[in-house]
From Swiss-Prot:
Pathway: Secondary metabolite biosynthesis; Alkaloid biosynthesis; Mycotoxin biosynthesis. InterPro entries: Phytyl_CoA_dOase-like. Iron/alpha-ketoglutarate-dependent dioxygenase; part of the gene cluster that mediates the biosynthesis of the aspoquinolone mycotoxins. Within the pathway, the iron/alpha-ketoglutarate-dependent dioxygenase asqJ acts as a (-)-cyclopenine synthase that converts 4'-methoxycyclopeptin into 4'-methoxydehydrocyclopeptin through dehydrogenation to form a double bond between C-alpha and C-beta of the O-methyltyrosine side chain. It is an enzyme of class 1 (oxidoreductase). The keyword Iron applies. One of its GO terms (molecular function) is dioxygenase activity. This is Iron/alpha-ketoglutarate-dependent dioxygenase asqJ. Its EC number is 1.14.11.81. Its cofactor is Fe cation. Keywords: Dioxygenase, Iron, Metal-binding, Oxidoreductase.
Length: 416
């Protein structure tokens, strides 16, 4: 299977309708910001194939906005002047209130004519030892053949029925609705009871565990913070540039800039990732940035991938999903957010039927929170213990037991 067509300067994507809230997955409940027409005029599609403002620069959030000059009710924003008003963490881009905006501020944006470095591509088979050092250096790497095509096929088949009927993330029927994902996105997590490929192949992937061991050894055990299939419908809007974990774990904002990553994200292509259907934008090296005043879409490169390839990024790598511009293609991915077990997962596997859990390997059980955890502390006393004993010992938890299809049904039925 050949690689998707490269993204060139002749490719173009339509300008967004900034008159409505597109429900992006980062900005929460943003207001609408209008771009200066003069700014638009200065940046043609030819010189800026991704759009002068990153397509969704109009979405506003006073804390997480990763954009450059725009207007809010006629007031022009300038990131250099705004971000210098007060000390901020490495992730806080603007002051908490709009009172610090300087109406007279002006900033310019120039197209970069030099050839950009592309995302490093490594083989899951031949370059395993290079993957994490590469991500540490560049903030991202594409792992070719992270999952085999057979696993991709089976995983897609197993999750299909659930993706088709999943309500939108912000559905009123949910008591913890997600208002930061677009209404054209479907997300299905807690995959263990509904996908044999996930619970047997993905959770026991030697490639995944080698990378996680390399990344998290200074902290101790790690587990799945979320494993989810995301499907993005035709014409799905682009996301704003962002860093992960900022709408669930604000503690990461208070870590030292040089602290080792506490979580990483495998974005596994379950369908082709092309420039036209919204392949992820990444800013290489941005995981080391503290000054975010000049973040722009001009600095991004695209993660073009075949099914089974994975884009690996850290929780500080600036990235975003691109816009689907064909109007006909659906893009699907498996996002596996792995993190140290000192962080609370975004998903809960407590409702997974015990027969399903007992069919797993001990390693997979630990990843889903059905085993006690250990830190790298010299005198570690353990995490998730019961009066000094492990979960698995106290509950007499078995492992690698045969599983009949009907034993996974309770949660599956409830999910449907």
């Amino acid at each position: 299977m050949g690689y998707p067509k490269a993204f060139t300067s002749s490719d173009s994507e339509p300008e967004p309708d900034l008159s409505r809230d597109l429900g992006n997955p980062v900005m929460g409940n943003p207001g609408v910001v209008s771009r200066s027409s003069s700014t638009v005029a200065q940046h043609s599609v030819r010189n800026n194939p991704t759009g002068p403002d990153g397509r969704l620069a109009g979405l506003w959030n006073a804390r997480a906005l990763l954009r450059f000059p725009a207007e809010v009710n006629g007031v022009r924003l300038d990131f250099k002047s705004v971000s210098s008003r007060r000390p901020t963490s490495r992730l806080s881009l603007l002051p908490y209130s709009l009172c610090s905006i300087c109406p007279s501020s002006q900033a310019t944006m120039t197209s970069k004519d030099h050839v950009k470095s592309q995302i490093p591509r490594l083989s899951a088979i031949n370059d395993l030892h290079k993957i994490w050092p590469t991500v540490e250096e560049h903030g991202a790497a594409i792992i070719e053949s992270f999952l085999s095509l057979d696993i991709v096929r089976r995983l897609n088949e197993e999750v299909d029925p659930f993706v088709k009927i999943e309500p939108i993330p912000a559905a009123k029927t949910k008591d913890h609705p997600n208002h930061v994902l677009s209404t054209t996105t479907r997300l299905v997590n807690v995959l263990a009871p509904i996908s044999k490929a996930y619970r047997e192949d993905v959770l026991n992937s030697k490639v995944l565990h080698r990378i996680c061991s390399d990344a998290f050894h200074v902290y101790g055990d790690y587990w799945v913070l979320m494993g989810a299939v995301m499907e993005l419908a035709p014409s799905n809007p682009a996301q704003p540039l962002h860093r992960d974990m900022r709408f669930s774990h604000p503690i990461v904002e208070y870590l030292k800039p040089d602290a080792p990553a506490t979580s990483i994200n495998f974005l596994v292509a379950l369908s082709p990732f092309t420039a036209e259907n919204g392949a992820t934008h990444v800013i290489l090296g941005s995981h080391k940035w503290q000054n975010l005043s000049n973040v722009s879409m001009d600095a991004t490169v695209r993660a073009l991938m075949n099914p089974g390839d994975a884009l690996l990024i850290t929780d500080s790598t600036i990235h975003c999903g691109g816009a689907e511009t064909t109007g006909t293609e659906t893009r699907r991915l498996l996002t596996i957010t792995m993190g140290i077990s000192q962080l609370t997962p975004l998903e809960s596997n407590l409702a997974v039927p015990r027969p399903v859990i007992e069919s797993l390997t001990p390693l997979a059980q630990r990843l889903l929170g059905w085993a006690s955890q250990r830190s790298a502390a010299p005198r570690d006393i353990g995490l998730l213990t019961i009066r000094g004993n492990s979960i698995e010992k106290t509950m007499n938890l078995k492992a690698e037991q045969p599983l009949h299809d009907d034993e996974a049904e309770p949660l599956c039925r409830e999910t449907i």
